[in-house]
Amino acid sequence: MNLCLCGWYFHPPLIAALVASKYPSVWVCHREPPKTFPLRYASGPNVGLEFGAYDQYLQHEWKAGPVVLLHDDTEITEDALDAISQMTVDQAFLFASAADAEANGKAHGRAMFCSDKFLTRLKTDGGFWYSEDPCDGKPIPATTANVPDYHNAGIQVFRAYLESLPKEFTVNRVAIVPGLRTGYRGRL
């Protein structure tokens, strides 16, 4: 199993956990990490929020095997990763608790598991959809009556894609993972 982290917070507890982990990881970031950064990384344009970063990983870094996709404002234990590595579904949204899953509508881009079979199909179908707007590198604005909901467009399109897959794919699942804690915009 491989890990793909996206973000630019470079959360120190997560870095320490991944340095000690047996699971290989790639950090997809939109700015260069600190000079002493001990992990493999790929930097690219800041477009598409997490789905843009996940697509960059899928198109340029992923070779084969299942992957855990995570925001970098996350804490996760090796026991949690071991449990995730035993998953037999093709795709699952990962949550710390049932209450966390309910609060997020049972879907989010902060943490998910994807099988090799699923990622192969997704890559064949063109990869993760993401909105390039606004594509000027500026922070994505808050949703208002005059500004589109950039923050939720990716997950809405992703869920529609999951629902379009043949029944042979076990997707759109929820997994409760003790030892996982996801943050929000750099805050845990």
Residue ranges and their predicted role:
Residues M1-L188:
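ER/Golgi luminal nucleotide-sugar-dependent glycosyltransferases, focusing on the catalytic module
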